Amino acid sequence: MKKAATPVKKHKALGDWRGEMLARVRKIIKEAAPGVVEEVKWRKPSNAMRGVPVWSHAGIICTGETYKSVVKLTCAKGASLDDPSRLFNSSLEGNTRRAIDIHEGEKIDEKALKALIRGAVALNTSKRIRP
């Protein structure tokens, strides 16, 4: 049986910095949350049928989208997460989500991103536990 491609494989086929960045983000997420579930959702013509990589653990942690000039990492419950390093720089006005827009040439603060991912896992897990 052929092994299923990772969600990022199709995005790496972009052949540019966006695919490389998404692969880097994926590696950081997997290091921060080794039990994370990866899926591709929302395939449609507007994203060349690549879909959107989604990382979950007891609920969606974040999604990774590629646009023409940005890789967007959206945390489903980002508004509820502590962000002392101020990684969130997009979708700041809402009550639920927060996003990190990464432009070509920008570096990722791995330590801060891992802390956000671990915080998202803890939040998702705590919401599942009922007294």
Say what each PLM segment does:
Residues 1-131:
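Charge-dense, helix-prone N-terminal extensions
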